[in-house]
Amino acid sequence: MEITASLVKELRERTGAGMMECKKALVENAGDIDAAAEWLRKSGLAKADKKADRVAAEGRIATAQAGGKAVLVEVNSETDFVAKDENFLAFTEVVANAALNSDAADAEALKSVKLDSGETIEERRAAVIAKVGENLQVRRLVRIDSANNVAAYVHGGRIGVLVELKGGDIELARGIAMHIAAMNPPHVKASDVPAEFVAKEKEIELAKMSEKDKAKPADILEKIISGKISKIVNEVTLYGQPYVLNTDQTVEQAVKAAGAEVIRFQRLAVGEGIEKVVEDYAAEVMKQAGLA
C-alpha cells in the first residue's frame, strides 16, 4: 500500500508522534493506520519506561467537584515548561475528572481507573509521556465527600485546598480555602495539635528564658510559658490565625460568627516532599574525566 502524505498526517493527528516516526510506523505495518497507531504506542511505552527513573518535581494541582464531592490531584512533570504544555494540562483535567467519578482512595488506586476511551489512567499517562518527552507521575489524590459545604480552591495550579464546613455557606468555605492556601496551617484547632509538639515547645521556651525569669515563682513562670505556647499554637492552627480576608478577626471568630465549624481540610502543593535534583554539570564532567 502506498504511504501517502495524508495518511502520515492523519496518523500524526491521532498520535502526536513526529512525521518520520509516523511514516516508519506505516511502512512497518503496510499502511494499516490502526496497526501503525498501536505500533507507535508500543514504541511510546518503551520510551516512557526509560524515563521512569527521572525526578518529576514540577507539575500541577487540578480539581474537580460536583456538589459536596470534590477531589484534588497532583500530577508531576520534570520541568515547568512541560507543566504548561497543553497535552499535560489536558491530562491533569482528565485525571481530576476520572478521580471524581471513581471511588479511588489514592493515586495508586487511580492508576487502574478506566476512561471513556477504554484506556486506564496509567495507559493514558504513558501515551502523554510519549508526546511530551518527560516522565510524568500521578502522585497524590485527596477527596472529600460530604453533605456539608465543600469548597475546592486552586491557586495558580500550584496549591490546592479542599475544605468541609458545617453550617455557614459556600462563600465562607471558599474564603477559608483561600486562607489555607496562603497560610498553610497544619491543624484546624488547638485540640488537634499533638501533645508531643506542645511539650517540645515548652522545653524550648524554658531553655530560652533568662536565669532571672526562671527564678520567678512557679505560677508566674507557668503563665509566661503558657502565653508563649498559646501564641505558637495559634500560629500552627487554622482557627488561631488572623483571617486573610479580614485580619481584624481570627478564622475561628469568622467561622463562629456564621454559626459554622470547619470539619476538615486537605491542602496539596506541587512537589512538596520531593527532593529536586540539582544538576552540577562541571562536577559530572570532572567525574567522568577522572578528575574528581
UniProtKB/Swiss-Prot annotation:
Residues 79-82 are annotated as: Involved in Mg(2+) ion dislocation from EF-Tu. It is found in: Cytoplasm. Gene3D superfamilies: 1.10.286.20, DNA helicase RuvA subunit, C-terminal domain, Elongation factor Ts, dimerisation domain. GO terms for molecular function: translation elongation factor activity. GO terms for cellular component: cytoplasm. This is Elongation factor Ts. The lineage of its organism: Bacteria, Pseudomonadati, Pseudomonadota, Gammaproteobacteria, Lysobacterales. The gene is tsf. Signal peptide: none annotated. InterPro entries: EF-Ts_dimer_sf, Transl_elong_EFTs/EF1B, Transl_elong_EFTs/EF1B_dimer, Transl_elong_Ts_CS, UBA-like_sf. Keywords: Cytoplasm, Elongation factor, Protein biosynthesis. Associates with the EF-Tu.GDP complex and induces the exchange of GDP to GTP. It remains bound to the aminoacyl-tRNA.EF-Tu.GTP complex up to the GTP hydrolysis stage on the ribosome. NCBIfam families: tsf. Belongs to the EF-Ts family.
